[in-house]
Amino acid sequence: MLCASQASTTTLCSTMDQTSQPSSSSSATIRLGGRAIDRHNPIIRDGRRLTPPPSPNLNPSSSSSSTYHTPLMTRLGLESSEQKRLAKRKSKKGDSDVGKSPVSCFSSDTPQGSSRYLLSNPVFFDGFVDSDPIPIPIDEPEITKADDLNNFHEDRLIINASKYLSTSASFLEKKQPDFFEGFLDYEPVLSPDNPFSEPTKASPTASLSSLEDKDVSSPDFKFSPPPPPPPSPPQSSPPSPPEKNSSSDQVVVLRVSLHCKGCAGKVKKHLSKLKGVTSYNIDFAAKKVTVTGDVTPLTVLASISKVKNAQFWPEIIQK
């Protein structure tokens, strides 16, 4: 490049010298092993960078969260739109969590006119308490002697009995007079003045009190004992069986064909089982069988005919 004048040539040379000077200094710093630090840079002169370094006794987490490790974009306030969006979401989520937690109702950040503050007031729920108030115990006087202790228990029993009687009396007064009419399980009592009057219903307590008022030792008082129980009917003795008359026994004589002693044994065995027979006699030689007992001739004949041939003895006339 050719210059038109000497002045322009000198100006060009001076500018080249100025540009070469910082390059030489930078090359010198590069040779020394680092970049030159500009002490007048506003980032270096920031107040947060001038804070003293953390002491070695602090936790490593606090040292890691110090401003020395803060990104450059955050320190310059040049956060990206994505980071701002995430921060807004976190803040909204934190607000919703704070609204749900019971501790947030009592936070000082809630204004006094808001509904959240009014709902968090514990006095708001005083009207909805449905439990009975706890009675305050009354200090009873100390009892030292045994007599005082007995008197104290008697007084308490009298008070309890009076309360019970008052409640029962008030209950009966509220009911109608014929409330217990269907529950009466006793008979009506006649009036003592007029025994022929209509029977009037009286309570058992009233009849008992009327008996107590009368003097048992007075001659007018008559006590009627309960009637004796009716006599039991005499036990009837069982009828005695009729005595057997010996004259009622009948004698039956039969002619039986007996061939041997075996035939006689069969007849004897059969007669022993016959009902009503008291005695019998077998004459083997004459072939004669005599039966005595409460039997009829036809019954004996029919029974023996089952074993052997038999017929009535000719001398006996059938009755």
Curated annotation (Swiss-Prot):
Tissue-by-tissue expression: Expressed in vascular tissues of cotyledons, rosette leaves and roots in developing seedlings before and during the floral transition. Expressed specifically in the phloem companion cells. Not detected in embryos or seeds. Not detected in the vegetative shoot apex.
Record InterPro entries: HMA_dom, HMA_dom_sf, NAKR1-3
CDD domains reported for this sequence: HMA
HMA domain location: 249-315
Biased composition (Low complexity): 14-27, 58-67
Pro residues: bias regions: 224-242
Domain of life: Eukaryota
GO molecular function list: metal ion binding
Biological processes per GO annotation: flower development; phloem transport; root morphogenesis; sodium ion homeostasis
A Pfam family per the record: HMA
Compositional bias of kind Polar residues: 1-13, 104-113, 200-210
Localization (cell): Cytoplasm; Nucleus; Endoplasmic reticulum
Record GO cellular component, one term: cytoplasm
Induction field: Circadian-regulation. Up-regulated by CO in leaves in response to long days.
Region (Disordered) residue spans: 1-113, 191-248
Record's function text: Required for root meristem maintenance after germination. Involved in phloem translocation, starch accumulation and flowering. Promotes flowering in the photoperiod pathway. Regulates long-distance movement of FT from leaves to the shoot apex through the phloem stream.
Protein name, entry field: Protein SODIUM POTASSIUM ROOT DEFECTIVE 1
Gene giving rise to this polypeptide: NAKR1
